[in-house]
């Protein structure tokens, strides 16, 4: 299989390591990386900053049409502003799962994500419905998982890197609530694609996981 046509879908719940691994893997391979979760967070940021209610779907859809999202050099831009750091706020984190349930939001972002898939070679895309909905024809599908304690510790470390001090018990509670929403939502729920490879990241380092995925890529390309 020609390298330029290779696309990888990486899915998993919050804290499973999918964004970190996808970013590191893309850097190692020199490929493109799209973090779809960042798209949902960017839209959430816009709604919060502009005090837009997401309960009136008709008016919300009109507003969504005016929002421009784009990726460049692993940074996400909201109406031409780099919001890569802003979207990591606790306020965005608190509301993003509710915004992600809105049909109009999912429709807008699914269209954008599919356009990116169609026009981007050597692509690694991570999220919650990439292998099942966004990129079902991906050359390699991976579903990452980890136990709740490990996921909470990772989230706490990520928060600390962003200057936020958070309580591990509260993080675990939030992760469980997020899991319930993600697995049970009506539109594009979080689920493992039938042909996805399950990798438990609980006891694996980033380097070990990247080595495993690199081996899987090589096997797929030889097939």
Swiss-Prot record:
Name of this protein: Cytidylate kinase
Compartments in which it is found: Cytoplasm
GO cellular component: cytosol
Main localization of the protein described in the UniProt heading: cytoplasm
Family of the protein in this entry: Belongs to the cytidylate kinase family. Type 1 subfamily.
GO MF entry, a single one: ATP binding
Keywords: ATP-binding, Cytoplasm, Kinase, Nucleotide-binding, Transferase
CDD domains xrefs: CMPK (cd02020)
UniProt keyword Aminoacyl-tRNA synthetase present: no
SUPFAM superfamilies, alphabetized: P-loop containing nucleoside triphosphate hydrolases (SSF52540)
Domain of life: Bacteria
PANTHER family noted in UniProt: CYTIDYLATE KINASE, CYTIDYLATE KINASE/PANTOATE-BETA-ALANINE LIGASE
Swiss-Prot/TrEMBL GO biological process terms: nucleobase-containing small molecule interconversion; pyrimidine nucleotide metabolic process
């Amino acid at each position: 299989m020609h390298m330029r046509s290779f696309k990888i879908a990486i899915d998993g719940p919050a804290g499973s390591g999918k964004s970190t691994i996808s970013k590191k893997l893309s850097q190692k391979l020199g490929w493109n990386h799209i973090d779809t979760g960042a798209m949902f967070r960017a839209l959430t940021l816009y709604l919060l900053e502009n005090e837009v209610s997401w309960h009136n779907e008709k008016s919300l859809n009109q507003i969504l049409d005016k929002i421009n999202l784009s990726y460049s050099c692993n940074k996400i831009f909201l109406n031409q502003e780099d919001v890569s750091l802003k979207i990591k706020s606790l306020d965005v984190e608190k509301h993003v799962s509710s915004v992600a349930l809105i049909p109009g939001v999912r429709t807008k972002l699914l269209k954008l994500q599919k356009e990116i898939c169609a026009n981007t070679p050597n692509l690694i895309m991570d999220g919650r419905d990439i292998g099942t909905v966004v990129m079902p024809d991906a050359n390699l599908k991976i579903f990452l998982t980890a136990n709740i304690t490990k996921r909470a510790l990772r989230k706490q470390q990520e928060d600390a890197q962003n200057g936020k001090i958070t309580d591990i018990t509260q993080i675990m509670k939030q992760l469980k609530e997020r899991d319930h929403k993600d697995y049970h939502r009506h539109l594009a729920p979080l689920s493992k694609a039938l042909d996805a490879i399950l990798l438990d990241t609980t006891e694996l380092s980033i380097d070990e996981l990247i080595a495993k995925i690199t081996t899987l890529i090589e096997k797929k390309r030889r097939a």
